[in-house]
């Protein structure tokens, strides 16, 4: 078993227009390379917990009406649960790439 995660050898998945992902899963943990682009707004509130690093670009997250802006180099920690529900928001022409770390719920 190797310890190198080679995202460059993985194919992109596109779960929604303006959102692409590559995921590496090991047991109950996963790493996700996530790319948002061009006016993407998540249609539903996410209640998953995430820890992540913004690799490129800028974007906003709506935390139930409170908007926070993130840029390249920022680290994000979002606890799971209703009180931390959130949606990613990108303006027209914006693009952002993130590396997310998640624990997979049973």
Q: What function would you assign to each model-found segment?
A:
Residues 1-28, 32-33:
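A short, N-terminal "cap"/entry segment at the start of jelly-roll beta-barrel domains
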Residues 25-28, 55, 80-82, 92:
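Short loop/turn positions at the edges of beta-strands in beta-sheet-rich folds
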Residues 27, 62-66:
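Short strand-coil-strand connectors
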Residues 30-46, 80-81:
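Conserved short histidine dyad/triad with adjacent acidic residue
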Residues 36, 45-61:
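Short, conserved beta-strand element in jelly-roll/cupin
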Residues 65-81:
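Short acidic-glycine-tyrosine-enriched beta hairpin
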Residues 80-106:
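Ligand-binding loop in jelly-roll beta-barrel domains
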